[in-house]
């Protein structure tokens, strides 16, 4: 049995060192896969921004048309009628100060997304040490601090993902599973790239997308030609 190192080397040899159209890259990524599990497919964008400057930070959310292959577990922190709305919309966990206390005392994080109403943020804000490092802190910019908790829950369940630049200017987001039909992965990736293009800060000068790569958990990275998608996003 070949070692993983030899397997990834064999996979890399089947990928040419050139940018591929998404429609060609996705089937190639699926062809060279060797892992025995259903890998996550990720898209990484290298942007021509300086994240040290607040006016060049790229951040946003987008609902991927075909989801991510798994339903996210959603926690809603609210009170009164908003709790009932969240439950009706399909939230997995719903509570108020009791949930805040549980997270603070136990470091509880058995969920994928947290939605809060504005009135609860005074308490939720104290959970920064637990939620912050995991990217779970509710934020108005990503639609997770809202009075419309029902819509927020439905969007997250439908495949809403957040994207933001890290300190090196990279955006790294999952776009589905390797088992997805190729056209669904192409749709999801195109939707993400389009959203990132539309989120370009006015302060960013020069070439915006400097590189784009599609990869799976264990597989090689494939360079993507985003020219056509960028042009369509601006039209």
UniProtKB/Swiss-Prot annotation:
This is Large ribosomal subunit protein uL1. It holds the Pfam family Ribosomal_L1. One of its GO terms (molecular function) is rRNA binding. Keywords: Repressor, Ribonucleoprotein, Ribosomal protein, RNA-binding, rRNA-binding, Translation regulation, tRNA-binding. The lineage of its organism: Bacteria, Pseudomonadati, Acidobacteriota, Terriglobia, Terriglobales. One of its GO terms (biological process) is regulation of translation. It comes from the Bacteria. It comes from Koribacter versatilis (strain Ellin345). Part of the 50S ribosomal subunit. PANTHER family: 54S RIBOSOMAL PROTEIN L1, MITOCHONDRIAL, LARGE RIBOSOMAL SUBUNIT PROTEIN UL1M. Binds directly to 23S rRNA. The L1 stalk is quite mobile in the ribosome, and is involved in E site tRNA release. Protein L1 is also a translational repressor protein, it controls the translation of the L11 operon by binding to its mRNA. One of its GO terms (cellular component) is large ribosomal subunit. Belongs to the universal ribosomal protein uL1 family.
């Amino acid at each position: 049995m070949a070692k993983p190192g030899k397997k990834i080397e064999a996979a890399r040899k089947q990928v040419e060192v050139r940018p591929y159209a998404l429609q060609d890259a996705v089937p190639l990524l699926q062809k060279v896969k060797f892992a025995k599990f259903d890998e996550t497919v990720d898209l990484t964008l290298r942007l021509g921004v300086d994240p040290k400057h607040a006016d060049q930070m790229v951040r946003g959310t987008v609902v991927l048309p075909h989801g991510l292959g798994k339903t996210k577990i959603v926690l809603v922190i609210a009170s009164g009628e908003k709790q009932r709305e969240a439950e009706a919309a399909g939230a997995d966990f719903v509570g108020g100060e009791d949930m805040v206390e549980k997270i603070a005392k136990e470091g509880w994080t058995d969920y994928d997304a947290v939605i809060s109403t504005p009135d609860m943020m005074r308490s939720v804000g104290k959970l920064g040490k637990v939620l912050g490092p995991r990217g779970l802190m509710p934020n108005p910019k990503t639609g997770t601090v809202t009075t419309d908790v029902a819509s927020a829950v439905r969007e997250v369940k439908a495949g809403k993902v957040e994207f933001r630049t890290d300190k090196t200017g990279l955006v790294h987001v999952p776009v589905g599973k390797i088992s997805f039909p190729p056209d669904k992965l192409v749709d999801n990736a195109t939707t993400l790239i389009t959203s990132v293009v539309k989120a370009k800060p006015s302060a960013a000068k020069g070439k915006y997308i400097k590189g784009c790569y599609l990869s799976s958990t264990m597989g090689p990275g494939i360079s993507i030609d985003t020219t056509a998608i960028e042009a369509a996003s601006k039209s």
